[in-house]
Amino acid sequence: MTYTISIRVYQTTPKGFFRPVERTNWKYANGGTWDEVRGEYVLTMGGSGTSGSLRFVSSDTDESFVATFGVHNYKRWCDIVTNLTNEQTALVINQEYYGVPIRDQARENQLTSYNVANAKGRRFAIEYTVTEGDNLKANLIIG
């Protein structure tokens, strides 16, 4: 079964503009693709057991983060990684969900929402607005 996750990005403060710089897909379940449709990022995956990541950077504040969305055992999941080093691209982070214990746990938790603050106190959140089925929707909120 093919899964899609449509993601809307909200930036709630003008103190640092985040721009998308990278999109990745994991290779399991026939991998996936990213599209942009009507201002939303749309991740299409070949089946359960894969994911995709978006990396955002703010040149204004020297901050970056990776937001990852996926389906595991037929349920959606999400995670956000902040305080990235230059070597921590979305490509690096995305593959860690399939073999690095701390990232594996985030995938296994199958959360419908997740929020975290970075070292500078900025908040980031993912909230799935459609949590079941094969046509999922989520909001990515940058505080």
Curated annotation (Swiss-Prot):
Practical use: Lectins can be used to recognize and purifiy specific glycoproteins, and for the purification of cells with specific surface glycoproteins. Has potential as anti-proliferative agent. Sold under the name lectin from Agaricus bisporus by Sigma-Aldrich and under the name of Agaricus bisporus (Mushroom) agglutinin (ABA) by USBiological.
InterPro entries, per the entry: Cytolysin/lectin, Fruit_body_lectin_fun
Presence of keyword Chloroplast: no
Annotated beta-D-Gal-(1->3)-alpha-D-GalNAc binding sites: 29, 48-49, 73
Description of how the protein assembles with itself and partners: Homotetramer.
Family per similarity comment: Belongs to the fungal fruit body lectin family.
The protein's name: Agaricus bisporus lectin
